[in-house]
């Protein structure tokens, strides 16, 4: 069983995270919902826990199963992670060859000393002093470590009910650490990112178990998307309320203690949309959203690289023309440098062009990096000639 509607959600969330990180002095930048869209990273964690539980909760019964699971998950996330990391190196080399630059090459965020922690996916454990190289990749580190935790939990607990009880404890532990030690509310990354992911991932596990229990008890079931019924009307109302709650929450929870509730709200939203019974589900199941959802991991992983290219183009234009291309602006108590070279509507067009570029590049990396990378790791498993669990019906990052 797949969850195409949740795939649609994933694609939209990836786009909003990409828009959140793009600093241009247009209307989009100041929209409260956009400023809070970093919270969709927690949606990814919850969604991942949900679908990984669906696919593997009864299939990790031996160390061989666990090893195969982790190899498949590594094949899902690592090739594109490594490719985007490597892609930043030529940009730093260009900076090193430039006559003058605002910062020295291969320093701070791009220090060579942080390459190994990135390659080994441990840069969400507080090893580094800040975000490094491809900034969004901290969450890939955190999520892969959550996969390891999930596999170990399934192998050690054995019984499904014990896995779920332990998942609740792990989710609570993650929440406790983030609430107790993060100085940015839930917006922790390189320092306590793993614990943030634990909170969301195992909330997703619980959401799936509730979904499973609800269906098993016959209280609710997945409804045919094209057959309006009383049930679909109720589902439509539930979906509408859930969507409204997400919009209001994301717009108001940024930068405050309310953000700690993000995984809980997103767990409820994932549970509601997993039944796929309302009109919003029918919309998200349409081909454009499915196409975007399939490429959401690439959208998420390449957008920082595209931003770097846009900013370098602005710097080069500023040097050649002598006209300022940036402006400093205080947002949410911090000074940000925004691309600014025309009217506000022009910056809105620039933001849309940026999103188009991100999607275009993501289409290429999906075809030439993601799919071949997964195939290579699957081939590696096949050569081992050992029974392997099947991959998740929907893969989430």
Task: Report the location of each language-model feature.
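Functionally critical transmembrane alpha-helices in membrane proteins and complexes, commonly lining
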Residues: 2-59, 78-85, 113-123, 340, ...
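Interfacial loop-to-helix transition and helix-capping segments at the boundaries
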Residues: 3-4, 29-41, 106-108, 129-142, ...
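Aromatic-anchored segments of alpha-helical transmembrane domains
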Residues: 15-22, 169-182, 242-253, 309-310
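Transmembrane alpha-helical segments and their boundary/interface "anchor" motifs
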Residues: 39-41, 57-94, 105-117, 144-146, ...
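Specific transmembrane alpha-helix
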Residues: 40-57, 138-155, 171-226, 259-281, ...
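Membrane-interface helix-loop-helix regions
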Residues: 78-142, 175-182, 192, 199, ...
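Alpha-helical transmembrane segments of multi-pass integral membrane proteins
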Residues: 201, 236-370
């Amino acid at each position: 069983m797949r969850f195409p509607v949740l795939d649609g959600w994933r694609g939209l969330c990836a786009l909003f995270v990409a828009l959140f990180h793009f600093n241009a002095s247009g209307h989009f930048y100041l929209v409260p919902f956009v400023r809070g869209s970093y919270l969709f990273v927690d949606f990814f964690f919850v969604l991942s826990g949900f679908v990984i539980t669906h696919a593997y909760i009864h299939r990790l019964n031996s160390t061989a199963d666990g090893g195969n699971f982790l190899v498949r998950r590594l094949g899902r996330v690592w090739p594109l992670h490594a490719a985007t990391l490597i892609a930043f190196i030529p940009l730093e080399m260009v900076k090193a060859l430039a006559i003058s630059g605002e910062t020295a090459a291969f320093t701070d965020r791009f220090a060579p000393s942080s390459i190994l922690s990135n390659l080994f996916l441990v840069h969400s454990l507080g090893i580094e002093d800040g975000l490094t190289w491809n900034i969004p990749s901290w969450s890939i580190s955190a999520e892969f470590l959550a996969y390891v935790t999930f596999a170990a939990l399934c192998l050690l607990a054995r019984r499904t009910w014990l896995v779920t009880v332990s998942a609740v404890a792990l989710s609570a532990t993650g929440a406790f650490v983030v609430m107790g030690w993060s100085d940015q509310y839930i917006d922790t990354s390189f320092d306590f990112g793993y614990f943030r992911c634990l909170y969301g991932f195992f909330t997703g596990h619980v959401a799936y178990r509730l979904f499973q229990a609800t269906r098993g008890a016959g209280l609710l079931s997945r409804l045919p998307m094209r057959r309006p019924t009383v049930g679909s009307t109720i589902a439509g109302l539930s979906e509408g309320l859930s969507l409204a709650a997400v919009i209001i929450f994301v717009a108001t929870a940024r930068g405050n203690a309310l953000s700690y509730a993000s995984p809980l709200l997103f767990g409820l939203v994932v549970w509601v949309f997993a039944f796929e019974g309302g009109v919003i589900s029918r919309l998200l199941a349409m081909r454009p959203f499915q196409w975007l959802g399939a490429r959401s991991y690439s959208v998420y992983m390449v957008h920082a690289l595209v931003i770097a290219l846009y900013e370098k183009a602005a710097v080069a234009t500023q040097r050649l023309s002598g006209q300022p291309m940036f402006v400093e602006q205080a947002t949410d108590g911090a000074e940000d440098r925004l691309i600014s070279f025309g009217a506000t509507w022009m910056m809105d067009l620039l933001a849309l062009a940026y999103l188009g570029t991100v999607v275009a590049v993501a289409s290429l990396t999906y075809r030439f990096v993601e799919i071949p990378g997964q195939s290579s790791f699957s081939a590696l498993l096949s050569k081992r000639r050992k029974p392997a669990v099947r991959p998740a019906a929907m893969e989430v990052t």
